[in-house]
From Swiss-Prot:
It comes from the Bacteria. It catalyses: L-glutamate 5-semialdehyde + phosphate + NADP(+) = L-glutamyl 5-phosphate + NADPH + H(+). Disulfide bonds: none annotated. Belongs to the gamma-glutamyl phosphate reductase family. This is Gamma-glutamyl phosphate reductase. One of its GO terms (biological process) is L-proline biosynthetic process. The gene is proA. NCBIfam families: PRK00197.1, proA. The keyword Amino-acid biosynthesis applies. Pathway: Amino-acid biosynthesis; L-proline biosynthesis; L-glutamate 5-semialdehyde from L-glutamate: step 2/2. Catalyzes the NADPH-dependent reduction of L-glutamate 5-phosphate into L-glutamate 5-semialdehyde and phosphate. The product spontaneously undergoes cyclization to form 1-pyrroline-5-carboxylate. Transmembrane segments: none annotated.
Length: 417
């Protein structure tokens, strides 16, 4: 292992003791101070962010993820304040029992320990991760992508300067070099890192899962579907589809495939009408293409190929699949879903119930946009990632997901027969 990396990880592990001694009220004050520092240094953050942006083409789908402007920085500071205001997740009693032999048993929440998060071109994640880890008593190891190196480095400087002002050990957070070659060393750091959370492309997540010797929670990749049922309301459908697809195309909760009941194909041109205003390219199956031909801009309409389904576009692109019934819609989702977010637009309550019960995803929606799959929108303050697995945590991971528990047993001298 690279000596510098090994030393950083050892220092981080050692710092867990110092972090656990910080009182909850102090952690809250420090996070509020960090939020104020973000607002105070908006121009400096934008200046560093521009250095990163200058190395990327504006047409790159990652450009929007990388961009930090005044509005986004203010929102980021507000998210930190929301996390600061949340109840302390540590020391919460999950279970209390008094046993017949006189033993008192409690199950209480504790930090996970050292959490490593590997992410790509979203520098706001740097602040989200630190605020959630700090509030929940976890040391965090940050490994951002090279695309955001200047921005991440400056944000880390703000974090460390804030900690120094409170005489807090700054080893509780570190930013590893962006070189991908160092990732294997991190993934092999058994005994030093308690959990790794990859956030980014499916390739990144697959690499981490396949090469890690430390525990991993898979997050991020979202192949998202919305099914417009036979009973769907056209007005609701237009708004939901437009929002889910075009609000922010570069995020994991953005719509990738619209599934439509064959009986409602006549309404398809109106359903996707607003998408043409955002120049959304549609990859339509044969039935959908026949209906949209001459009803959607020719240069934006393409006949779908098999590989267009089950694809996370992260761009102004949408696949459309026609199905004869809800069973086929659910079957298509089961085949291609990444188990992130799936939605149905319907007025038939039995169809809604069937969809919500049978579709296997971290978040399932009825008559709402999948854009809501977000820690802030779920009232979690922020999120460290959106888990697409079932073990330990699922969906947006807030403070509660960053804790484990331990059993505390008090006795008066009892021994077991």
């Amino acid at each position: 292992m690279n000596t510098d990396i090994a030393n950083q990880l050892r220092a981080a592990k050692k710092a867990t003791t110092d972090l656990n001694l910080i009182q909850s009220d102090t952690r809250t004050i420090i996070l509020e101070t960090l939020a104020a520092n973000l607002e105070k240094h908006i121009e400096n953050i934008i200046q560093e962010n521009q250095k990163d942006l200058s190395l990327m083409l504006e047409q790159d789908p990652r450009y929007d993820r990388l961009l930090l402007n005044k509005e986004r920085i203010l929102s980021l500071a507000n998210d930190v304040r929301k996390v600061a205001s949340l109840p302390n997740p540590l020391g919460v009693s999950l279970l209390e029992k008094s046993m017949p032999n006189g033993l008192s048993i409690k199950k209480i929440t504790v930090p996970l320990g050292v959490i490593a998060v590997i992410y790509e071109s979203r520098p706001n994640v740097t602040i989200d991760i630190f605020s959630l880890c700090f509030k929940s008593g976890n040391v965090c190891i940050l490994k951002g992508g090279k695309e955001a190196h200047f921005t991440n480095s400056y944000l880390l400087l703000l974090i460390k300067n804030t900690l120094k002002n409170f005489n807090i050990n700054t080893d509780i957070v570190c930013l590893l070099p962006p070189e991908r070659a160092l990732m294997t060393q991190l993934l092999n750091a058994t005994g030093l890192v308690d959990l790794c959370i990859p956030r980014g492309s499916q390739n990144l997540i697959n690499f981490v899962r396949d090469n890690a010797k430390i525990p991993v929670i898979e997050t991020g990749a979202g192949i998202v579907h919305t099914y417009f049922d036979k009973s769907g309301d056209l007005g609701k459908g237009k708004k939901i589809i437009n929002n889910a697809k075009t609000r922010r195309v570069s995020v994991c909760n953005a719509l990738d495939t619209l599934i439509i009941h064959a009986d409602r194909l006549k309404d398809l041109p109106e359903l996707v009408e607003t998408l043409s205003q955002k120049h959304v390219i549609i990859y339509a199956d044969q039935d959908a293409y026949h209906v949209l031909d001459k009803n959607y801009p020719e240069q934006l309409l393409i006949k779908a190929k098999p590989q267009d389904f089950g694809h996370e576009f992260l761009d102004y692109k949408l696949a459309i699949k026609t199905v004869p019934n809800i069973k086929a819609a659910i079957g298509h989702i089961q085949q291609f879903s990444s188990h992130h977010s799936e939605a149905i637009i319907a007025e038939d309550e039995s169809a809604i119930d069937q969809f919500l019960i049978e579709v296997d995803a971290a978040a399932v929606y009825a008559n709402a946009s999948t854009a809501f799959t977000d820690g802030g929108e779920f009232g979690l303050g922020a999120e460290i990632g959106i888990s697409t697995q079932k073990v330990h945590a699922r969906g947006p991971m807030g403070l509660e997901a960053l804790t484990s528990y331990k059993w505390v047993i008090r006795g008066t001298g009892q021994i077991r027969d």
